[in-house]
């Protein structure tokens, strides 16, 4: 009888000592899967002069190298309206990651750098704090020559920053395109 009495007294203590005080974990915002980056450059002075640069890596981190293409040369002495589209073509239908990058503009930034040929870049889209995003930009080739253009999308960079070297974060996609300016 005593055992039953102690057992009945223990039940409320056990019940109230087991509370559900676990806070729900914050969702992890993982890096985007990007298989394709398409850069479209439209000449401000001649709308029919369109240069398309694309990198496509349909097997993701698989063994095949990405296919990198540039449709033609850039023209010196002019400027181009640039736009970038990011896709995940491992999904069917392909998922447009550009929308997610633009919605999470405070967590992304596109960086541009040229080597061997002079180019200026001007950001045309910004996050809510006025920091650059880079899916819309202006590119101005400064003179004729050949070189490379590297475009890098960084996830969760430090903003503001002084460029890719101080941005931190992790790289969602980075590609170097061979370019010619005539």
Segments (PLM) and residue ranges:
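Short acidic/polar inter-strand loop motif in beta-rich domains
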Residues: 88-96, 156-163
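Short beta-strand segments enriched for Tyr within beta-sheet-rich domains
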Residues: 78-82
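Extended low-complexity, serine/threonine- and proline-enriched intrinsically disordered segments
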Residues: 35-41, 101-116
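Helix-rich interaction surfaces within compact, conserved domain-sized segments
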Residues: 114-171, 176-182
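Bacterial Sec-dependent N-terminal signal peptides
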Residues: 13-38
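Sec-dependent bacterial lipoprotein signal peptides
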Residues: 1-16
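N-terminal edge beta-strand
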Residues: 48-75
